[in-house]
């Protein structure tokens, strides 16, 4: 069996633990209450330990002792870079890098144990399944935390995952049962199950999922990954099989490039479990009774299961609107006030309010025949409005995939956020909503934007009623009806404005009272879009 490509060991390495006994003693002095300091100590000592020459059985025993402490600090530190806007702030990025580095040191430690298995070191062959499962699990944890941070999984991680499973197959332990007491609920696992968990999470379009949804998918896979089999021959199915190439560096696909060393995922049992639960949810059964967890509520639970069924168990459906490749520039901005400014082309002022000219403005008219627009030009700078420069990668009538390169300045973004976009060949802005986000290690920010139906216009709204007499207008946006899409006219309103059947005043060349009939959706920035 081929030797693993691992860093050189060092004769001057001097870790503070070298086996299970010394690891337990050392851990007693690690300040786990201070997770930042504990993470740094664990990282430093594991780096030193992974340079140290010792027997594979001693290395395995020490790693098994420290892994619970590692798991604890990693989960706690992840709170500092998840549920954050992108791109990451410097401090968030630093914690993220340290978290990945610690997972990688655990992975490297188990790879050194695996090398001991390959070299037939005394006492380690019986632990081959555990070693393979742990190595695959830590590759999966690195991937999972990239998904949670909406960071791109690099090709070398996919290659490491496939190679890890290939080693388990070569050793004949891919299906051998292993206990992992760090799992949340199900302790029974195997190298195959650890591999499947990482594969299916990567196939679930994680850049599109919320943190709650990602946690739920991980919860499901701990229970259901065992339902997916791996075969050397394609299973008999009506849809193209899911193909893994053990010599590749990509996620499995149904109709991807020809595989050099193919394996096939049989998802029939998984598909049956998903279909059964979707059917029972539609009949009114509660998610908790279907073992879907107390946190899973309808209708979002059913919607997510349907989404996962499509990703894992169905052939890729053709897009509703054809996409075309592009490299055209596009301008973008977020925040309703900034979008209003750029859509209207001028500073927002209270509608219908006649203002007396200042002496400076009268002087400008006398000298130049008009009022200077310099104050308006400076307005966007003063208020932090930025027209960002992005580049389109592909587009359709319904959406845009675009990228903002690391060197281009811009705001931070979150899923569901309102965005205004203006392609280079367009004179006007379109409104959209961020559907997915991903940042790569170079700092480039990728976004998928779903375009909202209708032509946008800058408008203003104010409340009605006796208690709000004299209320001022605030910025809002309107969208025209689109008959072809059965989309009625709608308003994009600031946070907190929507109430069922609420009547508001909209300024359209005069005050017009409109009734809000339905909330279409609420963005992550709390901006709502309502039918009128």
Predicted regions span which residues?
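Generic N-terminal leader/targeting and pre-domain segments
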Residues: 1-171
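Generic hydrophobic, helix-prone segments enriched in Leu/Val/Ile
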Residues: 46, 99, 105-114, 220-221, ...
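Extended, domain-scale alpha-helical bundle/helix-rich regions
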Residues: 168-353
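Short strand-loop-strand
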Residues: 312-428, 433-441, 446-458, 465-529
């Amino acid at each position: 069996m081929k030797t693993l490509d691992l860093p050189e060991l060092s004769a001057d390495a001097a870790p503070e633990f070298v086996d299970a006994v010394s690891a337990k003693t050392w851990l007693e002095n690690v300040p786990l209450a201070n997770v930042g300091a504990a993470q740094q100590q664990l990282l430093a000592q594991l780096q030193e330990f992974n340079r140290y020459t010792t027997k594979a059985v001693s290395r395995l025993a020490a790693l098994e002792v420290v892994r619970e402490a590692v798991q604890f600090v990693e989960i706690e530190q992840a709170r500092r870079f998840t549920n954050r806007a992108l791109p990451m702030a410097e401090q968030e990025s630093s914690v993220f890098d340290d978290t990945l580095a610690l997972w990688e040191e655990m992975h490297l430690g188990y790879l050194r144990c695996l090398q001991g298995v390959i070299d037939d070191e005394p006492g380690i062959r019986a632990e081959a399944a555990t070693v393979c499962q742990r190595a695959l699990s830590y590759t999966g944890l690195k991937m999972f935390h990239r998904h949670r941070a909406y960071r791109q999984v690099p090709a070398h991680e996919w290659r490491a995952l496939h190679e890890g499973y290939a080693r388990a197959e070569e050793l004949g332990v891919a299906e051998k049962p292993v206990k992992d007491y760090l799992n949340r609920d199900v302790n029974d696992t195997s190298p195959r199950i650890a591999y499947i968990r990482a594969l299916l999470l990567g196939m679930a379009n994680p850049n599109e999922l919320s943190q709650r949804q990602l946690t739920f998918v991980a919860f499901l896979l701990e229970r259901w990954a065992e339902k997916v089999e791996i075969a050397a021959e394609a299973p008999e199915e009506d849809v193209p099989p899911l193909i893994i190439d053990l010599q590749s560096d990509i996620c499995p696909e149904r109709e991807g490039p020809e595989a050099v060393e193919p394996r096939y995922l049989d998802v029939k049992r998984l598909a049956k479990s998903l279909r059964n639960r979707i059917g029972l949810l539609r009949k009114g059964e509660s998610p908790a009774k279907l073992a879907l967890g107390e946190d899973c509520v309808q209708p979002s639970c059913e919607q997510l299961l349907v989404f996962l069924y499509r990703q894992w168990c169905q052939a890729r459906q053709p897009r509703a609107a054809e996409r075309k490749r592009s490299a055209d520039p596009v301008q973008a901005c977020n925040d309703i006030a900034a979008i209003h400014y750029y859509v209207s082309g001028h500073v927002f002022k209270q509608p219908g309010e006649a203002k007396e000219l200042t002496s400076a403005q009268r002087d400008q008219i006398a000298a130049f025949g008009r009022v200077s627009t310099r104050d308006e030009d400076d307005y966007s700078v003063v208020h932090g409005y930025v027209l960002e420069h992005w580049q389109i990668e592909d587009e359709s009538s319904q959406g845009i995939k675009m990228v903002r390169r690391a060197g281009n300045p811009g705001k931070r973004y979150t899923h569901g956020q309102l965005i205004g976009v203006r392609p280079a060949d367009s004179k006007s802005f379109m409104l959209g909503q961020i559907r997915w986000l991903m940042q790569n290690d170079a700092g480039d920010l990728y976004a998928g934007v779903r375009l909202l139906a209708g032509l946008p216009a800058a408008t203003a709204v104010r409340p009605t009623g006796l208690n709000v007499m004299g209320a001022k207008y605030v910025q809002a946006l309107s969208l025209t009806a689109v008959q072809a899409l059965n989309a009625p006219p709608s308003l994009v309103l600031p946070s907190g404005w929507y109430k069922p059947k609420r009547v508001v005043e909209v300024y359209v060349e005069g005050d017009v009272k409109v009734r809000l009939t339905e909330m279409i959706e609420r963005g992550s920035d709390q901006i709502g879009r309502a039918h009128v």
